[in-house]
Amino acid sequence: MKVTSAIANKMIKKYQQEIDMLDSVIRQNAVFDAAINEKIEDARPDFDFEKTYNEIRNLEEKIVELKHHLNVFNTKTEIEIDCKKFTIDKLLVYVAQLNKNLFKIGSYVECPVKKRLANNGNLIEYRHINFSHDFVKNEHERLSELVNEILVKLDTVNNTVEFEIPDNLS
């Protein structure tokens, strides 16, 4: 069966939701209360712990397999950015680093070149920047454009490029 990484991630999310639902079923039915004058079998919920537990295990195995195939896809599929080829797994690390740098440098974009501080008696103090304002603005714009380019290319690959998974994972 062929899937895109977007579909594989949706399948993983769906399986995890099913696990969460089955966990809830176990919590609600693993123990039950019965009045002293009530027949226990009449009060016992219709529930098979072992079957439910095995369903969870089966779904967990599917998630492990899907994530493995997704990771293999991410380590083998390359995307070109600025004339350099990156595998998706490297690109995900790279875009996280770029976002950190974008946040850091963004905090200096609006920093005034010179700022008057509070008066201490007769002396007036100023705080001055110790960097090139033009560099900061240009670098912020460059990083922003690069992150956007990467995200668009990742989205395109995630939604269009298919890879093979075993049929039993669907």
Show which residues each predicted segment covers.
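Structural preference for solvent-exposed beta-strand-turn elements
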Residues: M1-S170
